[in-house]
Amino acid sequence: MKRQLILEDGTVLIGTGFGGEIEKSGEVVFTTGMTGYQETLSDPSYCGQIVTFTYPLIGNYGINRDDFESIHPSVNGLIVNEICDHPSNFRNEISLNDYLKERNIPGLAGIDTRKLTRKIRQYGTLRGRLCNMDADVEYIVSQLKATVFTDHVKRVSTKDPYPSPGRGHRVVLVDFGMKHGILRELNKRDCDVIVVPYNTTAEEILRLSPDGIMLSNGPGDPKDVPEAIEMLKDIIGKVPLFGICLGHQLFALASGANTSKLKFGHRGLNHPVKNLATGKVAITSQNHGYAVEEESVENTELEITHVALNDGTVEGLRHKKFPAFTVQYHPEASAGPEDANDLFEDFLTMIENFKKEGEELCQNA
């Protein structure tokens, strides 16, 4: 079955279709990960996107029950050079092709993914549509140019609060499109977690008496989530806070900094990040199309703690007065390296220190 990818600039790439027999549009992006395709498909941060894998062979270990980052995949399509139809792994339960058919997600194989990746790197992220061979190219191009992708966070966030009980610190986890890996890391440390929707107010969060607040990852432009920015303006300084990815960007906006769209984003498992305090470099997992503008941090109460070595963009922030820090990358590493996993320990240490300071103030009052 032939299928084509039509880009908003008029480019047409023809290959072999697999997965769902449906036409879908989305923002065409690329990821450099050699593995972790199951986590990528189920990562809500990819909501509404058509993901191109730069590694030539995808699907060779199949799909299993353990590696999902959300219950429902949010991607709009998948592009690979070659798909493996006969996976071999002791955990394999279903092939990638069959999984995409079940979920009605279209795929395209047999195209030059290097050519597509170079185009995205040169011209920036492009809107595209996976469609059948009889599609009207001129009409599709005109529709793509007029399309605006918004409200992704609303689509992937939980609709109602729910608990993930533990005996340790109570952490309110604000879900902007949370990866399950973040929740797993908190559960591993016996945190008493309450997951809340993206539009939960500061008053509602504080009513839960949290010891700490965690801001999850999520898809799209942080400026599309004004409710969260207003919530954070009322929260910062009252409770220890740790943000990841979109949570990092929202924290920056609430603190007076600015964000902007990257030319083609950071997506992959091998992005080097430098800790400015220690000089150490961590290899990190990343997935974002927006970043905090470095110059916008200067007139705020934030300090830059980490930078990307590939392009110098801001990768970490800390508040100068209050117990709050954020990172642009994914310390939970699902999938990816675990170099930054100790940031969860730093968060819990910050909670403990904040509690001790409060107790000392009460004793001295």
From Swiss-Prot:
**Which GO MF terms does the UniProt record name?**
ATP binding; carbamoyl-phosphate synthase (glutamine-hydrolyzing) activity; glutaminase activity
* One Pfam family this sequence matches: GATase
Task: Give UniProt keywords alphabetically.
Answer: Amino-acid biosynthesis, Arginine biosynthesis, ATP-binding, Glutamine amidotransferase, Ligase, Nucleotide-binding, Pyrimidine biosynthesis
CDD domains associated with the record: GATase1_CPSase
What EC number(s) does its UniProt record assign? Answer: 6.3.5.5
Check the record and name the InterPro entries matching this protein: Anth_synth/Amidotransfase, CarbamoylP_synth_ssu, CarbamoylP_synth_ssu_N, CarbP_synth_ssu_N_sf, Class_I_gatase-like, CPSase_GATase1, GATASE
Which GO biological process annotations does it have?
'de novo' pyrimidine nucleobase biosynthetic process; 'de novo' UMP biosynthetic process; glutamine metabolic process; L-arginine biosynthetic process
Segments for region (CPSase): 1-166, 1-169
Matches recorded under SUPFAM superfamilies: Carbamoyl phosphate synthetase, small subunit N-terminal domain (SSF52021), Class I glutamine amidotransferase-like (SSF52317)
Active-site residues (renumbered): 245, 330, 332
Q: What class of enzyme is it?
A: ligase
Q: In which pathway does it act?
A: Amino-acid biosynthesis; L-arginine biosynthesis; carbamoyl phosphate from bicarbonate: step 1/1; Pyrimidine metabolism; UMP biosynthesis via de novo pathway; (S)-dihydroorotate from bicarbonate: step 1/3
Boundaries of every Glutamine amidotransferase type-1 domain copy:
170-357
Q: Which residues bind L-glutamine?
A: 45, 218, 220, 246, 249, 287, 289-290
Question: What is the reaction catalyzed?
Answer: hydrogencarbonate + L-glutamine + 2 ATP + H2O = carbamoyl phosphate + L-glutamate + 2 ADP + phosphate + 2 H(+)
Q: How does it assemble?
A: Composed of two chains; the small (or glutamine) chain promotes the hydrolysis of glutamine to ammonia, which is used by the large (or ammonia) chain to synthesize carbamoyl phosphate. Tetramer of heterodimers (alpha,beta)4.
> What family is this?
Belongs to the CarA family.
Question: Function, please?
Answer: Small subunit of the glutamine-dependent carbamoyl phosphate synthetase (CPSase). CPSase catalyzes the formation of carbamoyl phosphate from the ammonia moiety of glutamine, carbonate, and phosphate donated by ATP, constituting the first step of 2 biosynthetic pathways, one leading to arginine and/or urea and the other to pyrimidine nucleotides. The small subunit (glutamine amidotransferase) binds and cleaves glutamine to supply the large subunit with the substrate ammonia.
Name recorded for this polypeptide = Carbamoyl phosphate synthase small chain
Instruction: Give the organism, scientific name.
Output: Bacillus cereus (strain ATCC 10987 / NRS 248)
The primary gene name is carA
